[in-house]
């Protein structure tokens, strides 16, 4: 997942406090500003370093970002990954669709998310880790 996992939860806080419309407007306005790193940025960076030792088509590791975001909020994510100089193999912007089916289709080995509901759906298809970070886990 992206927000509160790979990225900080700054955008998720806006969504939780003010709703989808405010989130979309905020992300569109900040599209050229990279997001701050979240708790798994180091893990993704390490995977990227391993991947960079191999040609893309021969890498033993494939990475995917599967997020509830959709256009226009995808632009900030893409620009952030470019600013970090991190390549991912797949990016799925699901616009709120259930993540479990997509994880199954992708053939993921493991998935990390900050929201318990997304973890429940994903865990039916793939080993799943609940990242206890961010506004979705407060309280």
Predicted regions and their residues:
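Alpha-helical substrate-recognition element adjacent to the catalytic core
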Residues: 3-93
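Asp-based, Mg2+/Mn2+-dependent phosphohydrolase catalytic module
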Residues: 2-29, 100, 104-105, 110, ...
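Active-site phosphate-binding/coordination module
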Residues: 85, 92-100, 112-114
């Amino acid at each position: 997942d992206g927000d509160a996992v790979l990225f900080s939860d700054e955008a998720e806080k806006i969504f939780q406090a003010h709703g989808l419309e405010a989130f979309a407007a905020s992300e569109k306005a900040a599209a050229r500003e990279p997001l701050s790193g979240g708790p798994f940025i180091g893990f993704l960076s390490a995977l990227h370093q391993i991947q960079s030792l191999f040609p893309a088509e021969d890498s033993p590791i494939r990475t995917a970002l599967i997020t509830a975001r959709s256009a226009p909020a995808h632009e900030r994510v893409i620009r952030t990954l470019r600013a970090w100089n991190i390549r991912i193999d797949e990016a799925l912007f699901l616009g709120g669709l259930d993540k479990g089916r997509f994880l199954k289709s992708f053939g993921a080995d493991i998935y990390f998310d900050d929201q318990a509901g997304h973890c429940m759906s994903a865990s039916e298809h793939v080993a799943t880790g609940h990242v206890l970070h961010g506004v979705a886990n407060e309280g």
